[in-house]
Amino acid sequence: MVLNKEIVLIHGTWCDGNVWGEFATGLRQMGYKVHTPSFRYHDLPYQECLAKVGTVTLQDYRDDLVALIESLDQPPLILGHSLGCLVAQMVAEKTEVAGMILMGPAPTADIFAFYPTMLACFGKHFLRWGFWKKAMPPYKKEFFKYCMNEQEESLKEEVFADLVPESGKVYTQMALHWFDKTKAAYVDFSRISCPVIVISGTKDKMTHPNIARRTAKNYRDSVLVSLTGADHMYESGKFQQKTLKVIKGWSQQNGFVD
């Protein structure tokens, strides 16, 4: 039995480390020691984040997490959600990790991502002059319709109330990666040899299920699981327990927990 195995949770767009809530509790009950960091400035109050986050880069997110991971006693698992999956892969390219859990992954640069629902969700930001250096505020209508489309209204309101702005620079590096001279969203998959599980949902409109399928194909030691009826919010609400069950089974199979 592996006791207190370290796992670092990497949240997605507009969120912070507090988003995990009962999901993190479920991982602790499996035997994991859970870390829930926030992306740079995402732990600040809304207006402070708005003023500072616009020009933060993908490399900033990666480097902050690499520093945390390398401070731990052992290489941890890393669990990413959405944008956090892209950052997780960037992290795993730079430092040793025991395994990766990727839920509704955002695309690395090699993967097509211009699906209609994704354009509808984020397109508004790219119509603003200076989008590449402006913070991207959470858009309520789009968040409800494309991220939490299968969830209860009360949960939608609860989650949205805690969201903060996202980096416009990060989204430019990810969505328009051919303009990024630093090639931040390009990942050398040959440098990552740990076991990987990719989790998707049949009703995920924020990151199309095809992206999850392509992500899994980039790794030799990978498993792809599709949750029937699940939207993008795997860690909350209706699909939380199903997601935890999948993670527990994979964790046991790989000897991470008993």
What are these regions (language model features)?
Residues 192, 198-200, 204:
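Short beta-strand/loop motif that positions the catalytic acidic residue
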Residues 205-211:
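Conserved alpha/beta-hydrolase "acid-adjacent" motif
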Residues 28-49:
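Conserved alpha/beta-hydrolase
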Residues 101-131, 170-178:
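Flexible "cap/lid" loop of the alpha/beta hydrolase fold
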Residues 134-187, 194:
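Alpha/beta-hydrolase
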Residues 12-15, 82, 202:
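Active-site glycine-rich loops that stabilize anionic/oxyanionic intermediates
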Residues 79-84, 88:
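Gly/Ala-rich beta-loop-alpha elbow adjacent to hydrolase catalytic centers
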Residues 222-258:
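Catalytic active-site module of serine/aspartate enzymes centered on a nucleophile-bearing elbow/loop
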